[in-house]
């Protein structure tokens, strides 16, 4: 992935972590992995995703599926989505077919439309393993 696409992907991974933790009623990514703690400062977001999956597994859950949306004018992400899905699947130990990643824009509206930033959202289904 390009540097810009990697930054966007990082935001998406954080959104997925937050959604997984929220679905398991385990607070959020900042609670478990504060960037003020030296061990988490500049950590690879894929490691956080793996640790998040381990945390929810410890509470008796597994990932069912992921529906993620990235909202950005740039970079254009369509060509990168299959690699993003495959990488996430490997990290989480699930099938890439259980991960939907969509890229959209705000049609030039708001801070994302002005290219001042991006946003990422995720909805997840987790299932009890017991």
What are these regions (language model features)?
Residues 67-72, 76, 82-112:
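Short, conserved loop-to-beta-strand elements that form functional interface hotspots
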Residues 1-9:
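Single conserved hydrophobic/aromatic residue that forms the stacking wall/gate
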Residues 21-25, 53-61, 82, 89-94, ...:
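Generic secondary-structure signature for well-ordered alpha-helical cores
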Residues 20-62, 73:
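Glycine- and Gly-Pro-enriched alpha-helical subdomains that act as flexible
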Residues 10, 42-47, 80-81:
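Glycine-rich anion/phosphate-binding loops
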Residues 112-130:
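C-terminal edge-of-domain segments
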Residues 6-7, 35-40, 108-112:
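A short glycine/serine-rich beta->alpha loop
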Residues 12-17:
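Short alpha-helix carrying the canonical HExxH Zn2+-binding catalytic motif
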């Amino acid at each position: 992935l390009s540097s810009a696409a990697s930054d966007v992907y990082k935001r998406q991974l954080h959104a997925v972590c937050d959604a997984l933790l929220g679905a398991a009623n385990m607070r959020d990514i900042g609670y478990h992995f504060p960037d003020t703690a030296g061990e988490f400062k500049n950590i690879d977001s894929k490691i956080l995703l793996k640790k998040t999956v381990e945390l929810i597994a410890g509470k008796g859950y597994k990932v069912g599926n992921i529906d993620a949306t990235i909202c950005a004018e740039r970079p254009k992400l369509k060509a990168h989505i299959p690699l993003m899905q495959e990488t996430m699947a490997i990290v989480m130990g699930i099938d890439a077919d259980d991960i939907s990643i969509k890229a959209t824009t705000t049609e030039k509206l708001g801070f994302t439309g002005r290219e001042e930033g991006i946003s990422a959202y995720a909805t997840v289904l987790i299932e009890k393993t017991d």
